């Protein structure tokens, strides 16, 4: 079921246990977290963090647009503020309202949400695990950024669709190499990291892919 806790939409399993992982799902609304939960094997509380403008709210710094799209505004610092408030309030609310103790805190995101999740883990140390699912790690300047910043997590899940690097857009096409570079960087930092290839393009099976990442974190953190 999905319940409202102080304005936050949170999925709680019907047979919730006394201790559950808390998954913060960047860019997902109620239907998104319900879809992810439906594909998961592990039980977890999942909180929705919907956004109105992915190109603005999930990007860490400005960048030019893709083709004829909107420029990337680089306003992810506002998402950090939301995450700060959430992490200061939600574990206490889950305990007082639902009788649930948070066992671990996980951050997941798809596409630009995956980019934002990894960036947030360089800015905060409150997440035990991070999943960048079909993450937009091609993003201008991210290779250089991640090379010079520590990722504050015990485990990181990375994935891409196998068709994602095969695109005519040169910026998007570097996503495979960029994700491999992030994987190498994280393993050298002794962070438990996995990089999975899924069949299909960037848009295929998004909730199922996110669920795979969430399950892996639940089992490996």
Protein language model annotation of sequence segments:
Residues 126-138:
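A conserved short beta-strand
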Residues 108-113, 117:
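Gly/Ala-rich beta-loop-alpha elbow adjacent to hydrolase catalytic centers
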Residues 18-22, 42-45, 126-129, 153-154, ...:
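Loop/turn elements at helix/coil->beta-strand transitions in domains of secreted/extracellular proteins
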Residues 9-11, 16-97:
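Serine-hydrolase catalytic machinery in alpha/beta-hydrolase-like enzymes
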Residues 100-103:
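Short helix-loop-beta connector
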Residues 136-218:
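The feature captures the conserved acid-bearing segment of alpha/beta-hydrolase catalytic domains
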Residues 24-27, 134, 160:
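The conserved beta1-alpha1 loop
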Residues 118-122:
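Short, hydrophobic alpha-helix immediately C-terminal to the catalytic nucleophile
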């Amino acid at each position: 079921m999905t319940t409202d806790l102080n304005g936050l939409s949170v999925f709680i399993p019907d047979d919730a246990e006394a201790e559950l992982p808390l998954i913060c799902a960047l860019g997902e609304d109620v239907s998104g977290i319900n879809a992810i939960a439906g594909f998961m094997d592990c039980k977890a509380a999942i909180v929705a963090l919907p956004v109105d403008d992915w190109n603005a709210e999930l990007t860490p710094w400005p960048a030019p647009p893709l083709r004829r799209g909107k420029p990337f505004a680089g306003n992810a610092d506002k998402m950090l503020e939301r995450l700060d408030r959430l992490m200061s309030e939600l574990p206490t609310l889950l305990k007082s309202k639902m009788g649930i103790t948070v066992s671990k805190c996980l951050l997941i995101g798809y596409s630009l949400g995956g980019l934002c999740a990894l960036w947030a883990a360089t800015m905060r140390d409150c997440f035990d695990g991070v999943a960048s699912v079909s993450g937009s790690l091609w993003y201008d300047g991210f290779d250089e950024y991640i090379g010079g910043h520590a990722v504050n997590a015990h485990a990181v899940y990375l994935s891409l669709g196998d068709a994602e690097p095969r695109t005519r857009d040169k910026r998007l096409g570097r996503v495979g190499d960029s994700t491999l570079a992030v994987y190498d960087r994280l393993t050298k930092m002794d962070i438990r990291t996995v990089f999975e290839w899924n069949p299909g393009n960037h848009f295929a099976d998004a909730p199922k892919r996110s669920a795979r990442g969430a399950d892996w974190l639940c089992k490996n953190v």
